[in-house]
Amino acid sequence: MLTITSYFGFLLAALTITPALFIGLNKIRLI
């Protein structure tokens, strides 16, 4: 159970961090 919950937590974190990184890169490119 712990491995499944930690996996979903990691997946959720990746889904939230990845778009943030793309937005940051786009802002840097615009500047």
From Swiss-Prot:
Membrane topology qualifier:
Single-pass membrane protein
Provide GO CC annotations from the record. chloroplast thylakoid membrane; cytochrome b6f complex
UniProt entry keywords in alphabetical sequence: Chloroplast, Electron transport, Membrane, Photosynthesis, Plastid, Thylakoid, Transmembrane, Transmembrane helix, Transport
List, alphabetically, the Pfam families matched.
PetL
Transmembrane ranges, per UniProt, are: 4-24
- Tell me where in or outside the cell this protein is found: Plastid, Chloroplast thylakoid membrane
Instruction: State whether keyword Thylakoid applies.
Output: yes
Disulfide cross-links: none
Molecular function terms from GO: electron transporter, transferring electrons within cytochrome b6/f complex of photosystem II activity
Q: Which GO terms describe its biological process?
A: photosynthesis
Self-association or partners: how does it assemble? Answer: The 4 large subunits of the cytochrome b6-f complex are cytochrome b6, subunit IV (17 kDa polypeptide, PetD), cytochrome f and the Rieske protein, while the 4 small subunits are PetG, PetL, PetM and PetN. The complex functions as a dimer.
Give the UniProt family note.
Answer: Belongs to the PetL family.
Role, per record: Component of the cytochrome b6-f complex, which mediates electron transfer between photosystem II (PSII) and photosystem I (PSI), cyclic electron flow around PSI, and state transitions. PetL is important for photoautotrophic growth as well as for electron transfer efficiency and stability of the cytochrome b6-f complex.
- Name it: Cytochrome b6-f complex subunit 6
Q: Which organism is it from?
A: Sorghum bicolor
